[in-house]
Amino acid sequence: MTPHINAPAGAFADVVLMPGDPLRAKYIAETFLENAEQVTNVRNMFGYTGTYKGRRISIMGHGMGIPSCSIYAKELITEYGVKKIIRVGSCGAVRADVKLRDIVIGSGACTDSKVNRIRFRDNDFAAIADFEMTLAAYQVAKQKNISVQVGNLFSADLFYTPDVAMFDVMEKYGILGVEMEAAGIYVVAAEYGVKSLAICTVSDHIRSGEKLSAEDRQLTFNEMIEIALESVLIGDQT
């Protein structure tokens, strides 16, 4: 057990899907897993373990922002032996060609956070996803005829940013989605020698003002979850 996870040793599978919202973790476990059992509930950050098509998989919320997700990712890796983490969450779009409900596979993640520089002795670390996990997710999407875009996310420290001009810079550099965690998870995974990936569904469009309801964010995004789960099965074959 840790200060943030009250699960016994062996409670988590080697692969964990991590949404930010603990209620989305509950929804994923109850909707997609067989024989799902809650294994942790500290601070109402729920974690579950069950099976998907016979494959043992866990679901664990990670909260909002790089500090929160870094704590949970680190403890899952070092205390519970997790080898692969897939963030499944929401993001905002800035580009006109990225629409509401589009799915983004984050091959890399930029950030304005200082956290990764602290880890990497004040140098920039290229926060990238594992290639095989990225490829597996892309292959699943193509097999299921689900439209996805692959490229850079931007992990922001501020949800309500005063620097709106930065959105123009993001668009210029081809950022597909703005969220708050991927860059942190990628670097925690790199630090401890495990694999990670972030798959996000566009819940807001920063330019147009379109957005999904809180209920939609919690209970939908099924295609993203299917891509993540099926990609685990493909990964087992490589």
UniProtKB/Swiss-Prot annotation:
CDD domains: PNP_EcPNPI-like. Phosphate binds at G20, R24, R43, R87, V88, G89, S90. The active site is at D204 (proton donor). GO terms for molecular function: purine-nucleoside phosphorylase activity. Disulfide bonds: none annotated. Its EC number is 2.4.2.1. One of its GO terms (cellular component) is cytosol. It catalyses: a purine D-ribonucleoside + phosphate = a purine nucleobase + alpha-D-ribose 1-phosphate; a purine 2'-deoxy-D-ribonucleoside + phosphate = a purine nucleobase + 2-deoxy-alpha-D-ribose 1-phosphate. A purine D-ribonucleoside binds at H4, E179, M180, E181, S203, D204. Catalyzes the reversible phosphorolytic breakdown of the N-glycosidic bond in the beta-(deoxy)ribonucleoside molecules, with the formation of the corresponding free purine bases and pentose-1-phosphate. Homohexamer; trimer of homodimers. Belongs to the PNP/UDP phosphorylase family. This is Purine nucleoside phosphorylase DeoD-type. It comes from Haemophilus ducreyi (strain 35000HP / ATCC 700724). The lineage of its organism: Bacteria, Pseudomonadati, Pseudomonadota, Gammaproteobacteria, Pasteurellales. The gene is deoD.
